[in-house]
């Protein structure tokens, strides 16, 4: 390999030399949580990236493993389909831990999405309407989606326009807090619409 690398156990110091491989070439590389590491990498040579993103160049796999060992880190294959494969010296245990943490946080955020329901009658009076509207706003401010249900009875079922108008009015009145995700539609005797909370910064 071109140049030389100064290493101490547990401390990857600096690579001295030149390389035609761009220092930014490894940015944005996706590392699989099941990537091959250390002795599992069985190719004659690799393009090596240091722990701080420095480009070491193309080296023999034996040399790459030794550099990782001397730095008290792991050799991780980050681009197996490249020719030669790209490997990075890094703390693989720390990487897997952080990846697992991100996955758990993502699942937690998905599970926290709650759908509340608010029911209205098509001929609701103004006072009740304001109360229902306040409930919808409160749900949206807490980050919940709201399923708004218009309940028709008897002859009211022959006048779906009452439901459409009421839902349109409500959507306009809460537009500062939420956006319609599912437009008004008939659902048996009822009519439903789903409003989702606005993302932060979009109010």
UniProtKB/Swiss-Prot annotation:
Location of this chain's protein in the cell: Cytoplasm
UniProt GO MF annotations: ribosome binding; translation initiation factor activity
Phosphoprotein in keyword set: no
Any Gene Ontology biological process: ribosome disassembly
GO cellular component, one term: membrane
Keywords in alphabetical order: Cytoplasm, Initiation factor, Protein biosynthesis
PROSITE patterns assigned: IF3
Subunit details: Monomer.
HAMAP family xref list: IF_3
Family according to the record: Belongs to the IF-3 family.
Main function: IF-3 binds to the 30S ribosomal subunit and shifts the equilibrium between 70S ribosomes and their 50S and 30S subunits in favor of the free subunits, thus enhancing the availability of 30S subunits on which protein synthesis initiation begins.
Protein name per its UniProtKB record: Translation initiation factor IF-3
Species classification: Bacteria, Bacillati, Actinomycetota, Actinomycetes, Mycobacteriales
Gene encoding the protein: infC
